[in-house]
């Protein structure tokens, strides 16, 4: 089934991968190589995923994302808001070519309210090709091309105002 829903992630001004020119206070967050879910969990008591949309879309319905992924007749889209202690911290959008969803990766269709990072970083076969940073107005964003068992998926994350990325003095979880 195809869908025409609008993305929760609006236009992002992407920076060069080679020279992201990031302020030091946000570089550590945006260039995080590990799980953002795990990183966020060090700054809150509870992470909840608010699933906004998931489903297949046709190739022509993708925006600039189609240039970053292999051509596929359909792509699985998953859009979420990651909330920490009941505050929205991150918008996430995952784009997965249909061929990536074969074998064990078929489980990506059934994550529901499970954070994507919990699934991805439990795999021994996960590799990140790159991280690209950008801005959506005053908000910082990043996108990563990941390879799960040598099969690609694109993850875009927009850090919302309550995110610890913007709270430079908040370093650890509150007691």
Curated annotation (Swiss-Prot):
It is found in: Cytoplasm. One of its GO terms (cellular component) is cytosol. It catalyses: chorismate = 4-hydroxybenzoate + pyruvate. GO terms for molecular function: chorismate lyase activity. Substrate binds at residues 36, 78, 116, 157. Keywords: Cytoplasm, Lyase, Pyruvate, Ubiquinone biosynthesis. Its EC number is 4.1.3.40. The keyword Zinc does not apply. It comes from the Bacteria. Pathway: Cofactor biosynthesis; ubiquinone biosynthesis. InterPro entries: Chorismate--pyruvate_lyase, Chorismate_lyase_/UTRA_dom_sf. It is an enzyme of class 4 (lyase). Belongs to the UbiC family. Monomer. Removes the pyruvyl group from chorismate, with concomitant aromatization of the ring, to provide 4-hydroxybenzoate (4HB) for the ubiquinone pathway. This is Chorismate pyruvate-lyase. The gene is ubiC.
């Amino acid at each position: 089934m195809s869908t025409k829903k609008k993305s929760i992630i609006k236009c992002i001004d992407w920076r060069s991968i080679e020279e992201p020119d990031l302020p030091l206070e946000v570089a550590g967050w945006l260039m995080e190589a590990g799980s953002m879910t795990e990183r966020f969990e060090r700054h809150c008591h509870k992470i909840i995923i608010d699933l906004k949309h998931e489903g297949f879309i046709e190739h022509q319905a993708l925006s600039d994302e189609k240039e970053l992924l292999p051509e596929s007749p359909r792509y699985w889209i998953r859009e979420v808001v990651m909330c920490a202690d009941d505050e929205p911290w991150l918008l996430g959008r995952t784009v997965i070519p249909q061929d990536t969803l074969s074998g064990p990766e078929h489980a990506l269709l059934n994550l529901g309210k499970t954070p994507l990072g919990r699934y991805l970083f439990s795999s021994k076969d996960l590799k990140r090709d790159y991280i690209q940073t950008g801005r959506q107005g005053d908000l910082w964003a990043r996108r990563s091309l990941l390879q799960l068992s040598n099969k690609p998926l694109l993850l875009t994350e927009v850090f919302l105002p309550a995110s610890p990325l913007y709270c430079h003095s908040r370093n650890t979880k509150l007691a």
